[in-house]
A protein has these predicted regions:
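Extracytoplasmic, non-cytosolic globular domains
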Residues: 96-145
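Aromatic-lined carbohydrate-binding/catalytic grooves of carbohydrate-active enzymes
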Residues: 1-29, 33-112, 116
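Glycan-recognition surfaces
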Residues: 66-71, 83-91, 95, 135-171
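Short low-complexity, flexible loop/linker segments enriched in glycine and/or proline
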Residues: 53-57, 122-126, 154
Length: 171
C-alpha cells in the first residue's frame, strides 16, 4: 500500500492502528513505551505499481517512471531499483525516510542491496536519506553475501550488513 506520492504505508489489515494517517506511529509509540526500538524491513527501490501508475515523486516535478532503473530482486519482483543519477530518486528516498522518521522508526533493513550486484549509489542514497530525515536510524543492508571487496564502502555507509545468504530449511 502506498500514498499518492508512492511512499510505502503499513497494511491496515495487519496493522489496524495504522488506519487513516497514523502510519506506524501508534505501534512505534507502544514499542518505545516498553523500552524497545522499532524497525521496518524494506525492499530496495520503488514499488513497480507506483511506476506503472507513474505517480509524482514528492517535492519534485518528476514522475516515478523517471527514477526507476529496471533492476529488481531475483526472488521478489515487486520493486524497481532507483536511478540515483537522477536527483529525483534521492528526493523519493528522502520523502520515504522523513515519513519513517515521523512514525518513530529506529531501524531500517534494506533488502536486495548486494546480490548479485552491489548497489553502491543506492547504499549512499539510503544513508543520505536517513541523515536528512531528522531522526537517527540504524541502517542494515541485506541480502548477503556482501563481498568483502565492498566492506569499506558498506562500513562507511551503513551500521550493519548481512554476510551470508538466507538460510532455508530443507527437511
Amino acid at each position: 500500500r502506498t500514498d499518492a506520492g508512492g511512499l510505502l504505508l503499513p497494511d491496515t489489515t495487519r496493522f489496524p492502528s495504522a488506519a487513516g494517517t497514523n502510519g506506524f506511529k501508534p505501534l512505534a509509540d507502544y514499542i518505545h513505551a516498553a523500552g524497545l526500538k522499532f524497525g521496518v524491513h524494506l525492499m530496495r527501490g520503488i514499488p513497480r505499481q507506483v511506476v506503472a501508475d507513474n505517480l509524482p515523486v514528492p517535492g519534485t516535478n518528476c514522475r516515478a517512471n523517471e527514477i526507476e532503473n529496471s533492476t529488481t530482486a531475483a526472488w521478489l519482483n515487486l520493486n524497481w531499483g532507483l536511478d540515483m543519477a537522477n536527483p529525483c530518486a534521492q528526493a523519493y528516498l528522502d520523502a520515504q525516510f522523513k515519513l519513517l522518521a515521523s512514525w518513530g522508526v529506529d531501524y531500517v533493513k534494506v533488502d536486495d542491496i548486494a546480490a548479485p550486484t552491489y548497489r553502491q549509489a543506492e547504499v549512499e542514497g539510503y544513508k543520505l536519506a536517513i541523515q536528512r530525515s531528522g531522526r537517527p536510524m540504524v541502517l542494515s543492508l541485506s541480502p548477503g553475501p556482501t563481498s568483502t571487496a565492498n566492506g569499506a564502502h558498506v562500513a562507511a555507509n551503513a551500521h550493519m550488513w548481512r554476510v551470508v545468504n538466507d538460510l532455508w530449511d530443507s527437511w
